[in-house]
C-alpha cells in the first residue's frame, strides 16, 4: 500500500501545452508533470485518490533537460517526467471549470 503522503508528492501539476490540450479533447487523456522517480502504479493511485476518477492506463516519458548558457556561464535544466493518464469512458477531469 502506498502512503498518503507519497501520493500527495507524486503529482507536481498539470502540463499545459498545445499537444496536451489536443490529447485531452480527443482521447480523454490528461498530462501531468510528476516527480522523476514516480512509478505508474503511484501515478494511477494518486490521480484516482485526488481527483476521484477512474484511470484506464498511464504512459510515462522523461524529457532530458537542455544545456543552456548565459554569457560565459553554462548550466543545465532539470529532467522532467510527464505522465499521460488515460481516463475510462464516461470519466471527466476539468481543471478550468469553476462554480456554475
Curated annotation (Swiss-Prot):
It comes from the Bacteria. The keyword Repressor does not apply. GO terms for cellular component: ribonucleoprotein complex; ribosome. GO terms for biological process: translation. Signal peptide: none annotated. Keywords: Ribonucleoprotein, Ribosomal protein, RNA-binding, rRNA-binding. One of the early assembly proteins it binds 23S rRNA. One of the proteins that surrounds the polypeptide exit tunnel on the outside of the ribosome. Forms the main docking site for trigger factor binding to the ribosome. Part of the 50S ribosomal subunit. Contacts protein L29, and trigger factor when it is bound to the ribosome. This is Large ribosomal subunit protein uL23.
